Amino acid sequence: MTQLSVNVNKIATLRNSRGGSLPSVLKLSELILDSGAHGITVHPRSDERHITKQDVFELQEFLRTYNEKITKLGISKKEYNIEGEPSERFLDLVLKAKPDQATLVPVKPGEITSDHGFQFADQKTFSTLKPIVEAIRKEGIRVSLFMETDFTFYDQVVALGAERIELYTGPFAHAFDLSEEKGKEIFTDYQRAAIEANKLGLAVNAGHDLDTNNLRVFAKLPYLKEVSIGHRLMAQSLVDGLETTVKSYLKVLSLGNETE
């Protein structure tokens, strides 16, 4: 089954909008995991507008103790995924927090959310990423790169030593919002990308604006290892509750190729 990692940035955004400690990122992360999610994702930006450095390390400690408890019961370990730009700031954070996975994402100044994958046509991209990826891998941390469906440069991901790609699903989700037919049309690009990535030995993650509607289609993606979902999951939880929402996402993912 495709793994679900829940991005908790929006919880931190709500907390920071008022100040103080409510809602609690830790308590709601625990509820998310207790509801069946396979991991927690954070994207700590340099301006700390949602997830802060303190959050990163508090979640690290929380997951350590949570995993100690559940593994004794025979339950599989929950993963910690930290996303961020390839910078010295982010590298330092990752090497100290030691997550299970570090997802490197290109960041533009002033952007509200990630909206594009790495472009290897620019040779600076490879040279910037190489030392970052090597330093993270040296610590035994899995590396994933945020990519689009153009698989021309997937061999560069392999050359860097990254083990996974995370497909940017914004274009698919936005097409699906217009109509399911349009979503299915663009979904073929993701199918080809996943197949080519697998041929190169890369595992495939995906994320951005996925929800229980468009996942009925996207969960069919070949070789889909993990989805990272935040904004739309949190939006749905305002209506249905967090536990119910997480379980509904897990149900759609579990159907996989059984969905139409």
Curated annotation (Swiss-Prot):
HAMAP family: PdxJ (MF_00279). It is found in: Cytoplasm. GO terms for biological process: pyridoxine biosynthetic process. The record marks 166 as: Transition state stabilizer. Homooctamer; tetramer of dimers. This is Pyridoxine 5'-phosphate synthase. The active site is at 43 (proton acceptor), 83 (proton acceptor), 208 (proton donor). It comes from the Bacteria. It comes from Leptospira biflexa serovar Patoc (strain Patoc 1 / ATCC 23582 / Paris). InterPro entries: Aldolase_TIM, PyrdxlP_synth_PdxJ, Pyridoxine-5'_phos_synth. GO terms for cellular component: cytosol. Its main location: cytoplasm.
